[in-house]
Amino acid sequence: MSTRPELKTVDVYNEDAILVSSIIKDLGRPLEILEAGCGLDWPLDLDGVDYRLTGIDLDKDALQSRIQKMGDLHEAIIGDLAAPATIPASRYDVIYNSFVLEHIPDAEGALINMLNGLKPGGLLVLRIPDRDSVYGWTARRMPFRLHIAYYRYFVRYPHAGKPGHSPFPTYYAPLISRAGIRDFCNRNGCTILEERGHTYYVRGTDVRVRITRAYAKALSAISLGALSWRHNNLTYVIRKGEAGSLGDDPVS
């Protein structure tokens, strides 16, 4: 019998962004925020918050697209999130990482670097696909060219596969799951404040949604429930403990 707590859900697109924005606003002080892996836009509404936003991305084309489209970064850094020196230690109040970890071979190393970049008690906002869902299982086995075709013709994203645009190659380390994140937090003294599963990908009456829902239910049944069909992605708000850096011996 599973000991995992019941998963709260995000049933409408952008509902988790509203939740996360509210949590960050409640911090009630000037903030240093890092977007670790830059998307093409910034989904959080932090109106009224005094904050400085830094963006880090290994893909210079993606970073340049963000700068040209939004112009909202106070600082832009080209760097590898899994490299220890990329993120300054204990600098940020909030680190936002959205659908990036699945693209990094050393996902745990990158996550440790992010936690090290947080001030004690800082918040990590993490959005990942669940490798133990039907969606994640399928993505892990789909050839990359087919993944691009899916985005271009099924999701109807015309820029799919172009430089700086999704989808990007994926690795789906074991960490990229409910069990993986909970184990990581338990080992590293972190507290999970929010854990939400995204369900809106199988909600609605559109033909594409109905096809997706039928496929997800069927594969979940074949797996005897080992693969979840009700959610595809996960959102976490994680609080760093009050201890020092992770993954290194204390510096005297």
Task: Give short role names for the model-derived ranges.
Residues E108-G109, N113, L123-G244:
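S-adenosyl-L-methionine-dependent methyltransferase catalytic module, highlighting the catalytic core
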Residues I104-P105, L118-P120:
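Helix-to-beta-strand junctions that scaffold the AdoMet/dcAdoMet cofactor pocket
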Residues I23-K25, I112-N116:
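Short amphipathic alpha-helices and their capping/turn segments at secondary-structure boundaries
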Residues M1-S90, V94-Y96, G197, H231-T235, ...:
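Conserved N-terminal segment of class I S-adenosyl-L-methionine
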Residues A83, E102, S133:
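Active-site micro-motifs of SAM-dependent methyltransferase domains
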Residues I33, G55, V100, V125-I128:
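Generic enzyme active-site microenvironment
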Residues V94-P105:
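A short SAM/SAH-binding and catalytic strip from SAM-dependent methyltransferases
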